[in-house]
């Protein structure tokens, strides 16, 4: 169950099926992002694709010597663009691939427009999602709900993305959903409808234990997306923002032109692949090792290129050297900027108090620490508001709740009204009234003992004590202990055996901390394979945008074969 591999396979197959010869790849805005996540431009160039164009671009030239591979979402807009294209074709022959199920009437419209008979084939290839990591996918949707209910357009897009994911992994799952969320139940029903309607597509070889799709709601854990992060990928997203593997460094003081935007992709960057889940402290020493390794391999200026053999060796090593030099400067810049922000915003202290708020139950200590940090001029309004949000969620119903006093402290610190209003919005979004589970107190004797022992021996790393609520949910699911009264099955049947292939989807967005949890569970649980997806992948900033978009605040204070379907063929 590798989503990067699944999407990569589809794109390889499209290019292979078009045969030898020069090609153009025609995409829309969304499929451009889908392709760029799994292939670099230079990799695709090696497959004789010499031109990349957008279907909505008005000024494309006529190039009759090129074959066109079209990879598009099956939207009305895209179908109209293709119809216009076929009436006045710019290329010699067209291979059309839709990223999801396309209606028969749309296929008929394409056939009628193809008077010059330039279409070689029309197929469905289900790469209709963003493959972020091998076990993490996103739909890049920010603001999926209005209040507690779906925005209809986003429900439709999410259903398409999730069913495409299932088809690309060849899974016809049983479905469980979070009972406390109306949105989770609605999505479960929509996915089930598609599976029933398109039953021929979902006829995969039966496995002994059927796969399981578990649909959750971000409202059940509003703590995780509010925390500062200390593992490389999660930290980069939290402090700099990752958008389709791209990081904008244009605001970094003294940044050179070629580093204003960098790409971090585990597919093409060995250092990133090896370090993305490591703690920030380890990254620092690994960067040092990378630098030292680079220094050893660096061609010495004095190195005499006397013989042809010397020159040949230099030229052969140079591309590798150049690539390594790019990797070194990129990671040194990124890590340098993370360090600068940690120091400038006093994030070590801030994060320690965040972890205390997320993991411990000492109210007076937490309150004292927040008040102390709110007095610190280095603590930004963003971080100050975030601390008060965590307090408001954790101690919402505590007998000594001091939220009004903290709100006054925020005002006195000069925190803008926007952030002050967000405190109540976050509680409205993910407070006790909404949650289907208890986020803070351990539920059974074993958990209470564990927490007590953890308190006694101290924690190895105070900055990474927190485990997302998803960890407990998946742990219970894997052990067959996830309560059916909280996470019912859709329909009459239930799973007797422990699940092996699990797809978890979070409405309202997943996080990189949760992706790390899934990565670790995959590594340490033999026989279990988990893929995590979300409407988006959040950092704190985007999560607060999600909360605002919901409008709630206004009311408060590996198989090698590819699943595809031929729509019509000539």
Swiss-Prot record:
The keyword Phosphoprotein applies. It comes from the Eukaryota. InterPro entries: Sec-1-like_dom1 (IPR043154), Sec-1-like_dom3a (IPR043127), Sec1-like (IPR001619), Sec1-like_dom2 (IPR027482), Sec1-like_sf (IPR036045). Transmembrane segments: none annotated. Pfam families: Sec1. Coiled coil: none annotated. Disulfide bonds: none annotated. One of its GO terms (cellular component) is endosome membrane. Keywords: Disease variant, Endosome, Golgi apparatus, Membrane, Phosphoprotein, Protein transport, Transport. It is a peripheral membrane protein. The modification Phosphoserine is found at residues 307, 441. One of its GO terms (biological process) is intracellular protein transport. It is found in: Golgi apparatus membrane; Endosome membrane. Ubiquitous. Expression was highest in testis, heart and brain, intermediate in kidney, spleen, prostate, ovary, small intestine and thymus and low in lung, skeletal muscle, placenta, colon, pancreas, peripheral blood leukocytes and liver. Belongs to the STXBP/unc-18/SEC1 family. May play a role in vesicle-mediated protein trafficking from the Golgi stack through the trans-Golgi network. PANTHER family: VESICLE PROTEIN SORTING-ASSOCIATED. It is linked to Neutropenia, severe congenital 5, autosomal recessive: An autosomal recessive primary immunodeficiency disorder characterized primarily by neutropenia and neutrophil dysfunction, a lack of response to G-CSF, life-threatening infections, bone marrow fibrosis, and renal extramedullary hematopoiesis. Interacts with STX6. Interacts with ZFYVE20. This is Vacuolar protein sorting-associated protein 45. The gene is VPS45.
């Amino acid at each position: 169950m590798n989503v990067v591999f699944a999407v990569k396979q589809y794109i390889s197959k499209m290019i292979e099926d078009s045969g030898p010869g020069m090609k153009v790849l025609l995409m829309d805005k969304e499929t451009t992002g889908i392709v760029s996540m799994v292939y670099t431009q230079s990799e695709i160039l090696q497959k004789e694709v010499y031109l990349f164009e957008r279907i909505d671009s008005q000024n494309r030239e006529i190039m009759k010597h090129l074959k066109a591979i079209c990879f598009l979402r099956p939207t009305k807009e895209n179908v109209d663009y293709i119809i216009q294209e076929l009436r006045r074709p710019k290329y010699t022959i067209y291979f059309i691939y839709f990223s999801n199920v396309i209606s028969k009437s749309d296929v008929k419209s394409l056939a009628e427009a193809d008077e010059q008979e330039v279409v070689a084939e029309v197929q469905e290839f289900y790469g209709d999602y963003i493959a972020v990591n091998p076990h993490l996918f996103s739909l890049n949707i920010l603001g999926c709900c209005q209040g507690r209910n779906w925005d209809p357009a986003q429900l439709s897009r999410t259903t398409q993305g999730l069913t495409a994911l299932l088809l690309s992994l060849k899974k016809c799952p049983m479905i469980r959903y979070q009972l406390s969320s109306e949105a989770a139940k609605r999505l479960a029903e929509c996915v089930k409808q598609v599976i029933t309607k398109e039953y021929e597509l979902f006829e995969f070889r039966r496995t002994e234990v059927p796969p399981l799709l578990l649909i959750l709601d971000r409202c059940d854990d509003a703590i995780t997306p509010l925390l500062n992060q200390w593992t490389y990928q999660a930290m980069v997203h939290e402090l700099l923002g990752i958008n389709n593997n791209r990081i904008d460094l244009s605001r970094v003081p003294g940044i050179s032109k070629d580093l204003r935007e960098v790409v971090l992709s585990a597919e093409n960057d060995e250092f990133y692949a090896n370090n993305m889940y490591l703690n920030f402290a380890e990254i620092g020493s690994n960067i040092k090792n990378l630098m030292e390794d680079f220094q050893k391999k660096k061609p010495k200026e004095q190195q005499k290129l006397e013989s042809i053999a010397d020159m040949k060796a230099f030229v052969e090593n140079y591309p590798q050297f150049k690539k390594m030099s790019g990797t070194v400067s990129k990671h040194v810049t990124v890590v340098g900027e993370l360090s600068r922000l940690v120091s400038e915003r006093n994030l070590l202290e801030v994060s320690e108090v965040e972890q205390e708020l997320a993991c411990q139950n000492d109210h007076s200590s937490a309150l004292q620490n927040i008040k102390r940090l709110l007095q610190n001029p280095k603590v930004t309004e963003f971080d100050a508001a975030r601390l008060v949000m965590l307090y408001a969620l954790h101690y919402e119903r505590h007998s000594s709740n001091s939220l009004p006093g903290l709100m006054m402290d925020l005002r006195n610190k000069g925190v803008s009204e926007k952030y002050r209003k967000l405190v109540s919005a976050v509680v409205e979004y993910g407070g006790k009234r909404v949650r289907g589970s208890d986020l803070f107190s351990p539920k059974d004797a074993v958990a209470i003992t564990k927490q007590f022992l953890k308190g006694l021996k101290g924690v190895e790393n105070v900055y990474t004590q927190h485990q997302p609520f998803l960890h407990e949910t998946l742990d219970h699911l894997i052990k067959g202990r996830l309560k059916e009264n909280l996470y019912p099955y859709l329909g009459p049947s239930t799973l007797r055996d422990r699940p092996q292939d699990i797809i978890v989807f979070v409405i309202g967005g997943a996080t990189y901390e949760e992706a790390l949890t899934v990565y670790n569970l995959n590594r340490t649980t033999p026989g279990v394979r988990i893929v995590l997806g979300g409407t988006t992948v959040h950092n704190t900033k985007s999560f607060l945008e999600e909360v605002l978009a919901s409008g709630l605040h206004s009311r408060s204070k590996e198989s090698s074969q590819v699943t595809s379907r031929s729509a019509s063929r000539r």
